[in-house]
Amino acid sequence: MFRTIANAWKTADLRKKMIFTLLIVLLYRIGANIPVPFVNITEALDTSGGNILTYFSMMTGSAFNYGTLFALGVTPYINSSIIIQLLGVAIPAIGRLEKEGEEGRKKIAAITRYLTIGLAVLQSVAYYFYIKNTNSDYLAPTEGTFAAVFEAIVIVICFTAGSALVMWLGEQINDRGIGNGISIILFAGIVSRIPTLIGSLWQYFTRGGVFYALSPIVLVCFLLMIAFIVWMDNAERRLPIQYAKRVVGRKMYGGQSTHMPIKVNMSGVLPIIFASSILSIPTTVQMFVNVEEGSFWEKFFNVFSSEHWPYAIIYFVLIIFFAYFYATIQYNPVEMANNLRKNNGAIPGIRPGKSTSDYIGKIINRVTLLGALLISVVALFPILFQLGTKAGGLDMQISMGGTSLIIVVGVALETVKQLESQMMMRHYKGFLD
């Protein structure tokens, strides 16, 4: 990976793109530290407990904890992209746009932008009320209804504008930089939390006792998880494909053997995001209602808190469910079998048509289960570790979870692959010139 980056840096055109991408990331990190008018959060907001605030904190690189200009980060854009992707299956009109080539993609991009702004407004309003309910001292004091309404409007506009600006920065990377813009910004936000992770591990290490032994173990486990995610991201099941020979005029076409790759982790981090979002709803509701100690509702809400064991079980089941749900959206065995037949291709030993589609469907189900189990292991490890240490009376908190690691490693690998393809393209171009 480092050799690829070093070789890309030697190419003038790629070097300009890499510098441009780094400058955009720098602008994003500056914006993530710019305060919003009327907001003065002196202490980081508590985003532990497995509620939706944990998700926002992870996605924004802790900018959410301090109410800065980019407090919402790329979250509205990611949520709107997921919604549009799901609507593409439910609404035929959107599904047709996805198949209309460049024009269709432009229309979908425009719809995604409008939906992003709408979600940003809603999330900004919710964030404002959360800050107000958490500690009224975090907002500038106001006198009268007009001043309070004006303050709320300014704060909501700033958070919404910050989210729109983050989306624009991501699109600039897409057009003039390297990698997927939104993914790069998300990567930068998560990586910015690494010093906090190292600092907390060092504090545990210096406390001595059992923490002296646990801290290096945690660090080694994280390194092993990174290696495991790299392997998982590149793992694929290859279905052999044989194309029949056909004669057109005096030329013979086909006859070659190839394969159809099916990625083990075909859904990426989406099942984890979906599962986290669903589980965050009850605990988010709990923040806005008064629950009596020892009541039924307190026990009910505790089930959905990451500080309790039932959360891990429900989380695991939801990840499996959403992995299958996403695989159903992404892969259509009948369509894949029809495309093979149209191109005179077949899987050796399998009859074309329904037998082929059934076979492909069976393979996809098996691969999906394996991939879902693997990402569940990565996502649940930090949660189970914290629950285990808490049960032992240690309560060792980890500031970076498995979701963050999957995103960081996935974005890094994808960016390196794009660099390699850009270098290959320029190599062939120079050869032809």
Where are the model-predicted features located?
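N-terminal cationic and glycine-rich segments that engage phosphates or anionic surfaces
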Residues: 1-98, 103-433
